[in-house]
Regions:
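Extracellular/lumenal regions of secretory-pathway proteins
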Residues: 1-169
């Protein structure tokens, strides 16, 4: 999944998100529509099996929109940038090797086109090349809730369960 919050760009949504499976777009949401919509016909089959799927995805879109817009404002302050065009992004998801069964989760954030903070999938530690986000990485590394839910449970279990459903269509 890709999430983007931006500021200072006229005639462009301040938030855009979309999901991909095997490099094929499956969903799209932005701050203008505030609704997550399917981008593949086979997603309708998924809806019949999981009737609340799109309602839940829309809720996630709206929640992530608020979170990313907040993160964008925090980043602008940390980098002492209040005006101009700025972009805050998150890319997260999972990979599953059907042959070996190997699972790999990833979660990374960027600001203005540069890496900001990334989950190292080997060490399960947050790392950052930027001094402005060292405190955030340290705080996340010491937060049991983030470590247990986000890193272990979601990225290596829930995400993979959904990925397996998607690739079956």
């Amino acid at each position: 999944y890709f999430y983007t919050a931006s500021s200072g760009i006229e005639n462009f949504p301040s938030y855009v998100s979309f999901g991909l499976v095997d490099d094929v777009q499956i969903s799209y949401c932005d701050s203008r529509t505030n609704e997550n919509i399917p981008k593949q016909d086979w997603m309708d089959e998924l809806s019949s099996e999981h009737p609340t799927y799109w309602m839940e995805e829309t809720e996630t879109c709206r929640d992530k929109q608020q979170i990313l817009k907040g993160n964008l404002e925090i980043a602008k302050k940390r980098f002492s940038q209040t005006e101009g065009v700025h972009v805050f992004q998150q890319m997260y998801g999972c990979e599953w090797d059907e042959e070996t069964g190997e699972v790999k989760g990833y979660d990374q954030f960027g600001y203005d086109g540069e890496d900001l903070i990334t989950l190292d999938s080997n060490t399960q530690q947050w790392v950052t090349p930027r001094t402005q986000t060292v405190n955030t990485a340290n705080r996340w590394n010491n937060d049991r809730t983030i470590k247990e839910h986000e890193e272990k449970f979601y990225l290596t279990q829930t995400c993979v369960e959904w990925l397996k459903k998607y690739v079956n269509y």
